[in-house]
Amino acid sequence: ADLDRFLYAPLARFTASGGKRTRPALCLLGCEAVGGEAARAMSAAAAIEVFQSAALIHDDIADKSELRRGEPCTYVTEGTGVAINIGDLGLTDVLGYVLRDQGLPADVRLAVMEKLLQMEERTIEGQALDLGWVRDGRWDILPEDYLYMASHKTAYYSAAIPLMAGAIVGGGTPEQLAALDGFGMAAGLAFQLQDD
């Protein structure tokens, strides 16, 4: 009962609490775009949504935000340490959703997990630059440095990887994956530029 109260229930509650679900929708669309059945990409879409939850829980702590989706942030209601742990669970769940999807062939699961791992790494790298520059009071950042940070922090996980993960499940060709990657990186970067 305590494990559920301190860990699983808060993550489930946060993930179900709203949001636009754009990233998992892009995953399903990526699958359909290459001729696949969207339902086959549900585990990848769920993995992307739980990553979003984990990233937002951690981001709220880093930014000292008070509200998320109109509600008190997880660290406000659960405490900082517990919230970090809840976010960490979300990060581990990312690969688990796909790993446990026995409806996908092993090679497809592996390829999707590789993309999801890339998504996690790039997003964390971008966040490290953003947080480090703010911490150090760096305002001498060149435009190309900002674009590198923004593409890593947002573009990979907001559009490029969701589209490619879905396309992998749908049996997309290397050319189709490359096209979705290019579109996704441009769309994700545009989202970050608008957000900033």
Task: Describe every region a protein language model picked out.
Residues 2-196:
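Mg2+-dependent prenyl diphosphate-binding active-site environment of isoprenoid biosynthetic enzymes
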